[in-house]
Regions:
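Soluble catalytic regions of membrane-associated enzymes that act on cell-envelope
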Residues: 2-178
Length: 180
């Protein structure tokens, strides 16, 4: 079934194609910002109850340090790596053996664009670097530093994917912003 298809996709040479979905980064306007935080978050959707959505975002929106916060949702179905490719590289991908993809496939990715503009680019993911071959394609996409679950031993793990919980990485994000 679905699990077998997923396992097969993880071993399949990736095929990239034009994007047929909207992207959240289309609303990103970093002009004049010397630091940018982009969070690509796998989600089961926005709550139908607007009050619940407001409660979820309340702490973030109350932060005085943000110059611009935008949020929203759109319909998308696929694995998290497909969302990453959509947002970071403006591409759709079938087949997740991304270590097999040539570096030139990633030259237009957002981290590479920011890197070429002089930004320091750092990626963090609580899962293993082996998952979706992130150890291979994150550097190709332009991330100068990539930190994964292997670097966060001892931090709390979430059962949904057995990786380090996003909330346990907040201090690591702060350290990265302080260092760059």
């Amino acid at each position: 079934g679905q699990n077998m298809a997923f396992l097969q996709a993880a071993q399949t040479q990736p095929v990239f194609s034009s994007l047929n979905f909207p992207r959240a980064v289309q609303h990103l306007n970093p002009t004049g910002s010397n630091k940018i935080l982009l969070v690509v978050n796998e989600s089961w959707g926005e709550p139908q109850n607007p009050a619940l959505q407001k409660a979820v975002l309340q702490g973030l929106l109350a932060q005085p340090a943000f110059e611009n916060v935008q949020h929203g949702s759109f319909l998308f179905v696929g694995a998290i790596v497909e969302g990453e490719m959509r947002e970071l590289c403006n591409a759709s991908v079938k087949g997740f053996a991304l270590k097999l993809a040539p570096p030139q496939q990633f030259t237009d990715c957002l981290p590479m664009q920011y890197r070429q503009q002089g930004y320091e680019t750092v990626a963090m993911h609580g899962a293993s670097s082996q998952m979706y071959d992130r150890f291979s394609w994150y550097p190709k996409a332009g991330f100068q530093q990539a930190l994964f679950g292997e670097q966060f031993l001892g931090k709390p793990r979430c059962e949904a994917f057995n990786g380090v919980c996003d909330s346990a990485l907040f201090d690591e994000v702060g350290k990265a912003f302080s260092a760059n």
